[in-house]
């Protein structure tokens, strides 16, 4: 699938088929590469119209770090759901269950494009571990080790 001159593996319509999140908490706009069982690269376009900017902070709007982490966790979910061929409405929910070694290196502001990079580092007994980083203009702004699981509901 092509959008403009950029390769698109999943557009927002396909992303919404896999993730239960909806506005204002859908934080992945496009997946540009996905290597099944290994890694994903995705984008989150940060607009001044994001609802959190009016309060964080009114005179110097900065994307909350917790939402950068959530964007990375959503990218991790897409990677695992696609890698494991999980069906939508399969009676399971994909949960974010842990985080280690998180670092916020630079603020993310309106107009930035977050490049979300997530790699599976381990999978054992229904628990996935990931190395994740978010970049803006080729510079790391956030990095973390994430842990997620799928559980029956």
UniProtKB/Swiss-Prot annotation:
Predominant cellular place of this UniProt entry's protein: cytoplasm
GO process annotations (BP): fatty acid biosynthetic process; lipid A biosynthetic process
Active-site annotation: 56
Q: What class of enzyme is it?
A: lyase
Under which EC number(s) is this enzyme classified? Answer: 4.2.1.59
The entry's localization annotation reads: Cytoplasm
- Cytoplasm in keyword set: yes
> GO molecular function terms here?
(3R)-hydroxyacyl-[acyl-carrier-protein] dehydratase activity
Supply the alphabetized keyword list.
Cytoplasm, Lipid A biosynthesis, Lipid biosynthesis, Lipid metabolism, Lyase
**Membrane-crossing residue ranges in chain numbering:** none
A GO CC annotation recorded here is:
cytoplasm
Keyword Iron tagged: no
Question: Which HAMAP family does the record cross-reference, listed alphabetically?
Answer: FabZ
PANTHER family listed in its UniProt record: 3-HYDROXYACYL-[ACYL-CARRIER-PROTEIN] DEHYDRATASE
Per the record, the similarity remark reads: Belongs to the thioester dehydratase family. FabZ subfamily.
What this chain does, per the record? Involved in unsaturated fatty acids biosynthesis. Catalyzes the dehydration of short chain beta-hydroxyacyl-ACPs and long chain saturated and unsaturated beta-hydroxyacyl-ACPs.
Q: What is this protein called?
A: 3-hydroxyacyl-[acyl-carrier-protein] dehydratase FabZ
> What organism does this protein naturally occur in?
Nitrosomonas europaea (strain ATCC 19718 / CIP 103999 / KCTC 2705 / NBRC 14298)
> By which gene is this protein encoded?
fabZ
